UniProtKB/Swiss-Prot annotation:
InterPro entries xrefs: Ribosomal_bL19, Ribosomal_bL19_CS, Ribosomal_bL19_sf, Translation_prot_SH3-like_sf
Family matches, as NCBIfam families: rplS_bact (TIGR01024)
GO cellular component: cytosolic large ribosomal subunit
Protein's name in the database: Large ribosomal subunit protein bL19
Family: Belongs to the bacterial ribosomal protein bL19 family.
GO molecular function: structural constituent of ribosome
Keyword Ribonucleoprotein: yes
Domain of life: Bacteria
Amino acid sequence: MNIIAQLEAEQCAKIEEKRQFPAFKPGDTVRVMVRVTEGTRTRVQAYEGVCIARSGGGLNETFTVRKISYGEGVERVFPVYSPLIEAVELVRRGKVRRAKLYYLRGLRGKAARIAEKRDYRKKGEKGVEKVETTPVSADIETQVAE
């Protein structure tokens, strides 16, 4: 590991200690709390929309959020490790089969909706849990290879 990558990893770890983001993917509806400075006043502004892309890695990782404001599509790119981002809330999970949802730019109205992912939680549980996957055992891999 070169020294630049090592320094970036240390900075990422330091920022992640201060705040935790939920694990979200393209297709998920998120609410991003952004610190906005107007003159001498600062306030926190909520920006809610569909995450249409995640790109980059390390300190340069970004995600793009698209929303419809007064009939116009508005997209905003947020750096994941920006100090201006106060929090990211996961509003709902979306069921998509693509990593980049740029095709939503050409769709209007009901065609631009994304189906909600069903997670079959028990009654009374709140929030979305991260589903853990188990690695495939070696004997199953050999059966598939034969």
